[in-house]
C-alpha cells in the first residue's frame, strides 16, 4: 500500500492519493484525501486513505515523504499505532535545506511543527543493489527491511511502483480538481 501527494502552493491544498497494490505492484484500489498546504493535517489525510483501503493482508504502508505540502507532515508512528501495520517513509533525493530555520520563519506555531518533525527521527540511508540511495524512516519494520521491500516492488529506477502510481494519480486528481474549479457555474 502506498500514499503520495501532489500540490502547487497556489492551490492552497494538497491531493493525497493512496493505492492498495500487490507485492508485484499491480494496483487493486485507490482512494483520495485533501490536506491544507502548510497545514497540520497530513497525518489525518493519510489516515483517511488507510481507513478506506486497508485490509488484513496489507503488509506495509509506504509513504512518499513525511514532511510534505509545504511543511505539513505525516506521522508514521501515529499511523503504525492506529492501524497496527508497519509504515515506511521514503525520500528519493538527498534532504536539503534547513527545515527548522524555514519553519521558524514561516509559521507562528513553529514550536509544534519542529517538535513533530523532530519526532519523525533521522532517516536511515539505504543503498539499492542498482546503486540508488533511498532515505528511509520506519515504524514497526527495520529500515533495511523497508528498503528491501521497496526494491522488491521497484520495476525500474528507484521509486517503488506503488508509490510511483500513487504520485501519478495524485497529480492527475489535482489537475482534475483545478479543472472543476473553472467550471463551478455548471453545478
Curated annotation (Swiss-Prot):
InterPro entries: Endo_dU
Gene3D superfamilies, sorted: archaeoglobus fulgidus dsm 4304 superfamily
Pfam family, one: DUF99
Domain of life: Archaea
Family: Belongs to the UPF0215 family.
Descriptive protein name: UPF0215 protein PAE0952
Organism: Pyrobaculum aerophilum (strain ATCC 51768 / DSM 7523 / JCM 9630 / CIP 104966 / NBRC 100827 / IM2)
